[in-house]
Amino acid sequence: PLDMTNISVNYDDKWLYNADRARLHTFVENCRQAMKTGEPGFSFNFGDKQNETLRNACTEVTSEDDSDVCNLGSINMSNIKDIEEFKHVVELGSKFLVCGTLRADLPYEKVYKVREKNRRLGLGLMGIHEWLLKRKAKYEVTPELHKWLEVYRDESKKAADSHCDRLYLSRPVAYRAIAP
């Protein structure tokens, strides 16, 4: 009955701060099973993010708000030559996704209200492996990639917030989402 079903385990503050040794056993057993079958996926949600159980292992999104939507789009890093161009593309991508929250036709009224409240964006990255290969790097976080990821984090929020302010819109509750 669970064939083709994604199973995800949510690790939250209650699990993190549990002094019981069963906590470690649970994690080890989950890892063992995931390495054997690919399930379960893990979701780590701690601190102020502990209620953001917004994804499973495939990054399929479910929100704690009924009828929520997320406007998604990705940047192909392998097509970008330098960090200045990347910064500009992140800015444009973020603004584009904000505009998409204004124009999309939605199925019913509640979705419009939740969208206005959350204005959830998911600016993603793809082509990271090819980007690394072009720089003769392994598939790992290099110092250069770390700088680019900082630009991605900072500029996506800055651009979306400033564009929302300019248009008198609510600011997004989320800005980025990267699929595996």
Annotate the PLM regions.
Residues 25, 31-36, 50, 59-67, ...:
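A general structural signal for short secondary-structure junctions and capping/turn motifs
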Residues 1-49:
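Glycine-rich ThDP/TPP pyrophosphate-binding loop and its adjacent helix/strand module
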Residues 2-21, 96-112, 116, 127, ...:
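Internal maturation/activation junctions in enzymes
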Residues 34-135:
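Function-dense linear segments that define catalytic or interfacial modules
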